[in-house]
Amino acid sequence: GEDMAKIVVMGAGIGGISQVYELRKALGKEHEVVLVGDSDHFEFTPSNPWVAVGWRKAEQIKVDLPELMSKYGIEFNGNGVRRLHADDNRLELNDDASLTYDYLVIATGPKLAFNEVNGLGPDGYTQSVCKTGHAATANLDFNKLVADPGPVIVGAAPMASCFGPAYEYLFILDTELKKRKIRDKIEMHFVTPEPYIGHLGLDGVGDTKSMLESEMRDRHVHWTTNAKITKVEDGKMHFTEVDDSGADKKQHELEFKHSMILPAFKGVDAVMDIEGLTNPRGFILIDDFQRNPKYQNIFAVGVCVAIPPVNATPIATGAPKTGYMIESMVTATTHNLANLLQGKEPDERGSWNAVCLADFGDTGVAFVALPQIPPRNTNWASRGKWVHLAKVAYEKYFLHKVRAAKTEPYYEKTIMKLIGVERLKESR
């Protein structure tokens, strides 16, 4: 009847899975909830650095979706979206089928813009931990490094916005190479567009600058900041170091045996260049309530939303979207969609708080920037073994959540408590 709405969630990552479970729980049975992914499985992206060094097998962080979704009353389609036709409330799928919706939640994550640097990425000469398949390939390359040690370059491309995993991978790699007693045979270099170590796209958080610099010194890692990677060849990286005004200062060429570089992100092709829906890089424009101002039946959550950079940097960088932000965007979207279905206006805002756990294998760094965009009332970072343990717990919890259709927000409940406890310890 007229009271039934069809809600489609586009993207089956951390945001999309959480979104369908919350919607299914919050909305009456008369409403239809559909999940569209671009494959038949979910992968837990935060664990990809562990896959790259062999601490996890890809299968351990993947979950098959079709049976699960039908078990929980959610329709599933794994064919992926070729194009969104927002004016017709319709998704054109990769198999030419069409899927119509009353409401759409876009949770696609990013398109990985490897093509912006010649030779970058899994089809070029560097590794990636952005997808689990990439991380599995990186593991093969890592094994070659172990068999025949040589220089390593880790870092991020210009316009990158997600730096945490680059630091994670650098330090996890260092930890694993020490375990294998070959760290002394390997020069490690970190190449980043950040204006300083620990900027993280957030203009630093608490003491991340000195904390991460000292971590690098302790681990004998060289670094170049304000670095713009221009080209990658087989075993050789070209990058330009700029000064604070952004003018070229020095050209560098570095040889490598193994390299993992995080690419810049863009919006996925399916939404590119839809006027009023996306910004020029394809990220979804949203209001305070996660809703697109032009297409009022479209919401967006996660890495695909447009948020402004925290500050201008000599080489353009973006601000990260962390697990805590994604979780709070999902919760706000569920509430606001439910309001619309009841004829009310959206009124819940997601919290733009950067809370990140960066695991270094033996230790780690947690940081909290509340709100993410300064001026901040909380700006705190801490280093310790507890971060590694918290990250392992988050992985276990989330994979369980996916399999059991749980909806409790983990950061809200567990991580924030843990951080509260750590902050209390430090203030005593």
Language-model features: where?
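FAD-binding core/adjacent interface of flavoenzyme oxidoreductases
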Residues: 3-4, 73-168, 172-181, 249, ...
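Beta1-alpha1 glycine-rich phosphate/pyrophosphate-binding loop at the start
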Residues: 5-75, 158-202, 419, 427-428
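A Rossmann-like FAD-binding core segment of flavoenzymes
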Residues: 30-34, 75-88, 99, 174-285, ...
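FAD-site-proximal beta/loop scaffold in flavoenzymes
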Residues: 113, 121-148, 255-328
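Internal hydrophobic alpha-helix adjacent to the cofactor/substrate pocket in enzyme cavities
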Residues: 324-351
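Flavin (FAD/FMN) cofactor-binding core of flavoprotein oxidoreductases
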Residues: 349-366
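C-terminal auxiliary extensions adjacent to catalytic cores
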Residues: 367-428
